[in-house]
């Protein structure tokens, strides 16, 4: 089982396709998971496994093109089959360009947006920017209402912080704070099932922006502050 398969870079993709072909040859089941896999990558991964299964060549169905979301694509010796699935009702979300020039301005905006409570996440593209933004947020909100998360923490500290994220902002959290800001880097995009009322993010490729937005109003909650009941993602632009 390989999760977040879209995150593979070009180097990893070459090895992944080779591994899929080998696994297909031995008939080993493989599950690939992604919420933002482009059609071309889906096609390449399906074709790699299909080559191993020995089902490519004349008469094989094409695997290119757009399909609905969510969907399950399966490969067997008989070929490729796509099953579109009825998903849950989509939560309307707005992406709003926002011009903020400094970490201090970000902290002041959050102080205003969370005046009636709520949990927000700020996603910066570098560790340095995350650290600077966290210091500004902490100076406004205090240490108890601010958390920093990035990849440079030691492994034990990173595990502890990930666990804290799930305890405070996970689906089944019973400790969700009244008001809190998490400042993070891209590490929060994947694998953490957390839910925030408001999001601020640096610009990023669209597939990564969609991954980030997946942490915004992720779960049904009837207790969100009134001003945060509309899911908003503020993109920090110069």
PLM region descriptions:
Residues 3-5, 203:
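Walker B catalytic acidic pair
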Residues 6-83:
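Post-DEXD/H (motif II) to motif III coupling segment of the RecA-like Helicase ATP-binding lobe
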Residues 7-10, 38, 129, 190, ...:
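Residues immediately C-terminal
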Residues 28, 53-130:
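Conserved interdomain linker/interface between the two RecA-like ATPase lobes of SF2 helicase motors
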Residues 44-51, 137-140, 197-198, 216:
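Short secondary-structure boundary/capping segments
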Residues 110-204:
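Conserved helicase/translocase motor-coupling segment
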Residues 216-238:
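Conserved segment of the helicase C-terminal RecA-like domain
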């Amino acid at each position: 089982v390989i999760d977040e398969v879209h995150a593979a870079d070009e180097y990893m993709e070459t090895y992944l396709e080779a591994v899929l072909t080998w696994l297909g040859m031995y008939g080993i089941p493989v599950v690939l998971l992604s919420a933002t896999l482009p059609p071309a990558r889906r096609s390449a991964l399906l074709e790699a496994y299909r080559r191993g299964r020995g089902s490519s060549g004349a008469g094989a169905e094409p695997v290119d093109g757009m399909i609905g979301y969510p969907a399950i694509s399966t490969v067997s010796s008989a070929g490729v089959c796509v099953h579109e699935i009825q998903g849950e009702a989509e939560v309307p979300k707005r992406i709003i360009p926002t011009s903020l020039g400094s970490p201090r301005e970000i902290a002041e905006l959050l102080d205003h947006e969370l005046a009636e409570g709520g949990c927000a996440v700020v996603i910066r593209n570098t560790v340095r920017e995350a650290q600077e933004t966290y210091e500004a947020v902490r100076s406004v909100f205090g240490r108890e209402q601010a958390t920093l998360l990035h990849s440079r923490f030691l492994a034990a500290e990173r595990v502890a912080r990930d666990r804290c994220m799930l305890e405070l902002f996970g689906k089944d959290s019973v400790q969700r704070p009244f008001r809190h800001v998490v400042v993070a880097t891209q590490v929060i995009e994947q694998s953490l099932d957390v839910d925030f009322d408001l999001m601020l993010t640096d610009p990023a490729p669209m597939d990564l922006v969609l991954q980030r937005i997946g942490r915004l109003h992720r779960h049904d909650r009837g207790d969100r502050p009134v001003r945060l009941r509309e899911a908003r993602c503020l993109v920090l632009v110069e």
